[in-house]
Amino acid sequence: MEIYLIGQYQFDGSEPTYRCFYEESDAKRCARELIEESEDDDEEAMEVTWDDFLDRWDCWVCFMEVLEVE
C-alpha cells in the first residue's frame, strides 16, 4: 500500500505539519490547493503533477513523499 505524505515547514522554525493521504488523487488535490494559495495566477495551477509540486515549492517550505507500507 502507498501513503502519500505532504508536509509543510513552518517559517517560525516550529515543527512541520503533515497531511497523509491514501489516494494519489487526494494528495494531488491538496498539492493543487497549496499551489493555488501561493499564487495569484490560476491558469498555471490547472493540472498538478508531482514534478510541478516539487518545482514550485522550495524544499525548505514543503515536501512530498510516497511511502510504501505493508
Identify the residue ranges that each predicted region occupies.
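Short, mixed-charge low-complexity intrinsically disordered segments
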Residues: 33-70
